[in-house]
Amino acid sequence: MEMMRNPKNTKQEIKLAFFYIIDGAIIALMLVLASYMPKVVPVGGFGRIMFYVLFGTFGLFLCIKPHNSPTNRNIFVILDMLKMDNKNYHPIEVNTISSETKRK
């Protein structure tokens, strides 16, 4: 009997149409927060629309995967930055493929 191997990556994301469910949840949460903001800060109709636009845009920003960390969304990158210990140095490890023009 042949030995079975574990897959290299077991992370799965569920996609509806062209949108991941976690991205939709982040944006929906931001829009729910935008609907509650006029109760905290009294504004007119234009202010309510601006809350929806600003919070929706911020939700999209949190969903984007930055190019220096392509596996994590901005929300997780920001949370990692907040959890980071400022008293210790943590080098940024970038695994890149060396180019052919590099001198030996």
UniProtKB/Swiss-Prot annotation:
One of its GO terms (cellular component) is plasma membrane. It is a multi-pass membrane protein. It comes from Bacillus anthracis. The keyword Membrane applies. Keywords: Cell membrane, Membrane, Plasmid, Transmembrane, Transmembrane helix. The chain crosses the membrane at residues 16-36, 44-64. It is found in: Cell membrane. This is Uncharacterized protein pXO2-11/BXB0010/GBAA_pXO2_0010.
